């Protein structure tokens, strides 16, 4: 049986565009195959969900504060009216520990991201030349991908 998905074309497109929008069949399996192929080509990979991402640059790359959920009546004396702010390390910090490797950030459920959030992901890729980002933008009958900038033009400008 021939190898159906070698990942060569995907790797070439990822190298040239740095940021891809991908449409995979809903039954799954393609993501892990492509991730395995990219790891074999020397990428360090990190997969996470795009839900609840907020500001992508701050959430993925910088130390930021998160307020815990409000749990009803609490005393105002200790923490003020807004509550205490807990510092959270960047979600993709383990991806940026090694500077010598190419890095691949794979975001699931990318269809929930707004146009400005997608544009900030492209900006993150242009600032870090070793980082590539793949955003899953929904399902399709067959595996397809295109540059994220082309997806933004097609989806939001029309």
UniProtKB/Swiss-Prot annotation:
Question: A single GO CC term, please?
Answer: plasma membrane-derived thylakoid membrane
What GO molecular function terms would the record report?
oxidoreductase activity, acting on NAD(P)H, quinone or similar compound as acceptor; quinone binding
Keywords recorded for this protein, A-Z: Membrane, NAD, NADP, Plastoquinone, Quinone, Thylakoid, Translocase, Transport
Alphabetized InterPro entries for the sequence:
NAD(P)H-quinone_OxRdtase_su_N (IPR020874)
Q: What is this protein called?
A: NAD(P)H-quinone oxidoreductase subunit N
The main location is: membrane
Originating organism? Prochlorococcus marinus (strain MIT 9312)
Topology in the lipid bilayer: Peripheral membrane protein
Is the keyword Thylakoid assigned to this protein? yes
Domain of life, per UniProt, equals Bacteria
**What is the main EC category here?**
translocase
């Amino acid at each position: 049986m021939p190898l159906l998905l070698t990942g060569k074309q995907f790797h070439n497109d990822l190298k040239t565009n740095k940021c891809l929008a991908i449409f995979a069949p809903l039954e799954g399996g393609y993501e892990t195959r492509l991730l395995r192929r990219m790891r074999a080509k020397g990428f360090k990979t990190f997969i996470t969900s795009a839900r609840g991402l907020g500001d992508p640059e701050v959430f993925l790359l910088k130390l930021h504060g998160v307020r815990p959920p409000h749990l009803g009546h609490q005393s105002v004396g200790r923490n003020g009216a807004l509550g205490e702010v807990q510092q959270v390390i960047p979600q993709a910090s383990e991806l940026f520990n090694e500077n010598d490797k190419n890095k691949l950030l794979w975001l699931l459920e990318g269809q929930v991201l707004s146009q400005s959030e997608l544009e900030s992901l492209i900006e993150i890729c242009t600032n870090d030349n070793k980082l590539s980002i793949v955003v899953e933008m929904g399902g399709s009958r067959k595996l397809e991908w295109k540059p994220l900038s082309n997806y933004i033009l097609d989806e939001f400008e029309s």
